[in-house]
Amino acid sequence: MAAQQQGRGSGAAVLAAAVLLCVLLHAHVAESAVFTVGDRGGWSFNTNTWTNGKRFKAGDVLVFKYDSTAHNVVAVNAAGYKGCSAPGGAKVYKSGNDRVTLARGTNYFICSIPGHCQAGMKIGVTAA
């Protein structure tokens, strides 16, 4: 009988831990914000000031909306951002409705269509 009582207690503890884990995971997901790059104008030229006044956290999602026949989005490093060049192996998005989850630190994005980045189609987003 004592063994049965102990078994029920252990089961309740496991259930409580599982519920707590679900609540914590849900809270983390609920904290993430979704931002549309360029707001209503979408991903376009001169969106490099779009980040002004916004606060980003690791796990937040950027949505890039654009004409996929004219533009793309490439995740680059600081050198790629500064030089408007996509290094080999860079992640290229081209659906016209791309979702990118921010990592902690500065995340850089450019359009790699010739001349577009140089014309201001690039952003750097710093996530805390």
PLM features per residue range, with description:
Residues 71-77:
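Beta-strand acidic-aromatic groove motif in beta-rich domains, primarily in extracellular
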